[in-house]
A protein has these predicted regions:
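Alpha-helical transmembrane segments of integral membrane proteins, especially early/N-terminal helices
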Residues: 1-11, 75-80
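Alpha-helical transmembrane segments and their helix-start/interface "positive-inside/aromatic belt" motifs
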Residues: 27-43
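Alpha-helical transmembrane segments of polytopic integral membrane proteins
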Residues: 13-18, 45-49, 53, 119-124
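Outer-pore turret/helix-boundary of cation channels
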Residues: 40, 44-82
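N-terminal signal-anchor/start-transfer transmembrane helix
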Residues: 5-23
Length: 134
C-alpha cells in the first residue's frame, strides 16, 4: 500500500512540475498567477517529499535520525518531523537537528537539488522574459 501511495505522490510532484514549466513559457512570465503557481509548486514539493519520508518512517525504514536515534513518537509527531525535515531540506536551511540515513540521503539530495535549481530557473526565465520584452 505504501508503494502505491508513494507512486501517486511522485506522479503529483511530476504534474506540478509540468504545470509550472508550461506556465514558464507563456508570454507574461512575471505575474501574480506565476508567483502563486511557484508557491503552489514549492508547497506541493514540500508536502510530497514530506509524505515520502513519512511513508518510509511508517514502513519502519530508517530514513531520518534525530540526535542519533530513529524518529519515534506517534503518527502526528512523525508527520510534523517529516514535513519539517522536508522544508529544511528544500529551502537549504539544514539546521542539523535531523539527519538523513540510508534511502533518506538519496531523497534529501534529490530534494535539495530541486530546491537549488528552481530559483535559478525562475530567475533566468524572468531575466530572459524582461530582455525579450525590451
Amino acid at each position: 500500500m505504501e508503494l502505491i501511495v508513494g507512486i501517486i505522490i511522485a506522479v503529483c510532484i511530476f504534474m506540478s512540475f509540468k504545470t509550472v514549466v508550461k506556465a514558464c513559457f507563456q508570454k507574461n512570465f512575471l505575474s501574480y498567477e506565476t508567483v502563486i503557481m511557484i508557491t503552489y509548486l514549492y508547497i506541493s514539493l514540500l508536502v510530497g517529499f514530506g509524505m515520502i519520508y513519512l511513508i518510509c518512517i511508517q514502513s519502519n525504514m530508517e530514513v531520518l535520525i534525530e540526535a542519533g536515534n530513529p524518529i519515534s513518537g506517534g503518527y502526528f509527531d512523525k508527520l510534523v518531523t517529516a514535513l519539517y525535515f522536508s522544508a529544511v531540506t528544500l529551502f537549504s536551511v539544514g539546521y542539523g537537528d535531523l539527519a538523513p540515513i540510508g534511502l533518506g540521503r538519496f531523497l534529501a539530495v534529490i530534494e535539495a537539488l530541486i530546491g537549488y535549481v528552481l530559483p535559478a530557473v525562475f530567475l533566468a526565465r524572468t531575466v530572459i522574459g524582461i530582455e525579450n520584452s525590451n
